[in-house]
Amino acid sequence: MNIYQDVEHMLMEAFNKVLCPKEIGKIDQNLINVEPPRDKEHGDVATNVAMVFANKLSIKSRDLAIKICNELDRNDYVSAVKVAGPGFIIIKLVDEVWFESLEFILKSGKDYGSSALGTGKKINIEYVSANPTGPLHAAHARGAVVGDALARLLMKTGYEVCKEYYINDAGSQVDILGKSTFLRYQEILGDDSIVIPDGHYPGAYLKDIAAEIVEKDGNKWLSRSVEERSDAFRKYSVQMMMEKVKADLNSLGIEMDIFSSERSLIQSGGVDSVLSILEERELLYEGVLDPPKGKQSENWISRPQRLFKSTLFGDDVDRAIQKTDGSWTYFASDIAYHYDKYKRGFYEMIDIWGADHGGYVKRMQSAVNAVTFDEATLDVKICQIVHMLKDGKPVRMSKRSGDFVTIEDVVTAVGKDVIRFIMPVSYTHLTLPTKRIV
C-alpha cells in the first residue's frame, strides 16, 4: 500500500474524465510530482499534474486544475481539494486513508516496504573509505550513515548489496603514519629529545599503538635498519588504525562486507592491468596539462605526463594517471579499484563521497565508462560538510594537526541512534557544537 501511488491513480481516473485517453498518452508521467506540500497545514498531498498536462496540451493550467479538482471532490477518499498558485493541486485525504495505511503497516511488520525491484541485481556501495591515519572523526559519520542507510534500503528492495570500504594504504601518508608511530615508540622508550615534525601525525592515539609495540617487541626496533622498521611500523599502524575504524563503525551499527586494500591492488598488478586496457583502446597519451583554472601558483610547472582522454567520456579536461617520476597518480589506482569491482560482477556501483571530492566525479565516471566499455555505471552521492563549533567558532578537523572530534566522542555523548537520525540528509550542511560532545 502506497498512499502517493493511490493518489496518482486517482489523478489518472480524474483525467480520463476530463481529457480523452489519447491526450493523456502524449504526456511523460515521470514529470508528475505527487508529494507532501511544503506546509503540512495546507493539506496531505500536492501535485503539479495540471501544470504538466496543460503545458503539453496548450491549456491554461489553472483552468485544467479546477476541472481536475471538481472530479477529485467526488472521490470518497478526498476530504478537501483546492487549487494553489498557477495550477498546483492540494489534496486533503479523509482520516480513513491514514487508518488503513497504519493498519497495513502493522500487519506487514518487518516486511513493510519490501519489494522485488532489485531481485537478481548486484550493486556495490563504497562508503567512508577514510585514510587509515587516525580515528574516524565526526564528519566521517555522515558518509557512514548515509551509505549504510542506502544499503539497507536497497537490500529491502531485493538487491544483492556489497558494502565496501577502500583502504587508502598505498600513499605517502601511511609512510608518514609509520614514521610518526616510530617517534612515539622512541619517546616511550625514554628519548626526551623527540619532537613531532610538521606534516607528521601528532595525535595521542599513536602513543597507544607505540605502547603496544613496546609491550610486544621491547626496544628491538631501535637497532633495525630504517627500511625494515619503516615497513613494520607502517604495517602495524595501519592494522591497528583499521581495527579502530571497524570498532567505530560497529558503534554506529555499521558492518562492512569487504575491506579492500589499495596497496594489495597495486602489488597484484591491478593498475598495470587496467592501464593496458586503456592503452589498447588508444585512450592514453603523453601531454601537458594547463594550469588549474582560477588558481595562480608560482610553483606550477608545465611538464609532460601520461594522460587519460577522459574528455571523450564527458569530463572537462583530460587527466593525469602517471607522474613524471613514473609513479601512479591516485586517479590511476582509483580506476584500477573500480575495474576490480566490475570484474567481481558489479555492474552498478555507488560511491559516497564528501563535498571536497565533488570535482572528482566526472573523471571517475568517465574512467568507469572507458574500462568497462559502458557496461558498468558509477553513481556518486555527495555528502555536504559537517561543521564543528568550539566556543561558537568553526573548528577545522585535521588528523595532521591532531585537532578533531572523533566518532567515539560523539557516540559516547549522544548515542548511535541520535547520530543515525540527524546524519542521513546528505545535501545540507550540518553544524555540531563540540561543547555538548566533548
Model-predicted regions and their roles:
Residues 16, 26-47, 52, 59-433:
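NTP-dependent nucleotidyl-transfer catalytic core
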Residues 1-31:
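Charged, compositionally biased N-terminal leader segments and the immediate start
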Residues 434-438:
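N-terminal low-complexity segments that are often proline-rich with Ser/Thr-Pro
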